[in-house]
UniProtKB/Swiss-Prot annotation:
Organism for this UniProt entry: Encephalitozoon hellem
GO MF terms, alphabetically ordered: GTP binding; GTPase activity; metal ion binding; structural constituent of cytoskeleton
Stated name of the protein: Tubulin beta chain
UniProt xrefs under Gene3D superfamilies: Helix hairpin bin, Tubulin/FtsZ, C-terminal domain, Tubulin/FtsZ, GTPase domain
Lineage, top ranks: Eukaryota, Fungi, Fungi incertae sedis, Microsporidia, Unikaryonidae
Pfam families membership: Tubulin, Tubulin_C
Amino acid sequence: MREIIHLQTGQCGNQVGCKFWETISGEHGIDQTGKYVGTSDNQLERVNVYYNEASSKKYVPRAVLIDLEPGTMDAVRQGPFGDLFRPDNFVFGQSGAGNNWAKGHYTEGAELIDSVMDVVRKEAESSDCLQGFQITHSLGGGTGAGMGTLLLSKIREDFPDRMICTFSVVPSPKVSDTVVEPYNATLSIHQLVENADETFCIDNEALYDICFRTLKMSNPGYGDLNHLVSLVMSGVTTCLRFPGQLNADLRKLAVNMIPFPRLHFFVVGSAPLIAIGTQKFKTYSVSELTQQMFDSKNMMTACDPRKGRYLTVAAMFRGKISMKDVDEQMSMVQSKNSTLFVEWIPSNVKTAVCDIAPTGLEMSATFVGNTTSIQELFKRISDQFTVMFRRKAFLHWYTGEGMDEMEFSEAESNMNDLLSEYQQYQDATVEDAEEFLVN
């Protein structure tokens, strides 16, 4: 089977990751102890993608849980799904990274990385035909950002031909919990550009907006935000886990989504959006799902796709859906909003359809877009970075761990290059496209 090894680093990564395991365990009929209690053969047909089957008919996630302090790990162990994970796969330090990227990447993280890689190799060896890795982390802190990107480069070294996709929680302007977020995020993006194959950008501000505006919650907590992220993670991987009429895997997704290797940062969305624990009263049609899916209010990334242009889009539908409906809706969206799609990629939309709907719904859709408007997100971080870096504010925390200012300048210029690449392709027309080909 095409296995995927899941890695979660830092507090945010571990909380998002645990929610993801809750969601897909529910879909596969696996209870909190790893026993199968489902009702349909489809649930077990490809359960091996994410689970190892242990001797006692127990299904164990192919997950490695990593943090530089024991607190989050203890919380996971005591949580409802604490017994699901393999005890050896918890790898943690004692000191913490204190929101310092350099600690996660160069000092504390570097001390722990070998034990993490041992566990990763063990998981890879127990796989039949490893497809790749997925990492959940945040870019604003120390462990998820610093150690998460160190892990990324180590995996790239050891498994050069496997796909690596990251679900990265990007710092957002209105919801900031750390002053040095712009530094940590810029240094991380510098790494992601070089080492990740696909990065799904998720942003707390957009998630809060969805909770307030769409789900009408009065005070959403991180649990609610993580639930939304887990919907997208489960949607993106549906085709790998269940039989479908039109399948996608990580590599197919990458081939269809990434026209230029550096531009692999995606906005994501999900439809219909339903809060935890609420009952659904409405059945949706394919056209309603498509409309919702392309609606900027449903995006889990704080940038407005209407301000940029889509290079490519992938849409994953789930449920008993006719392919004809899907194709019609997709071509309608493209012709109605033709200005939002670049015209030098003739068929920008890749669709996948999986027959098994998520728990409690008749049909759902997951949206992944490669849009040039994501530069808004990078621009915000870059501006905040520049303001602080010009004054060399807080730099001593990083140089004290052995970093050089040079590395900051490199990360800054890499970020600026990325911005201008997105801008270049946003402005490009078919006539320019001929010039690209000549170059």
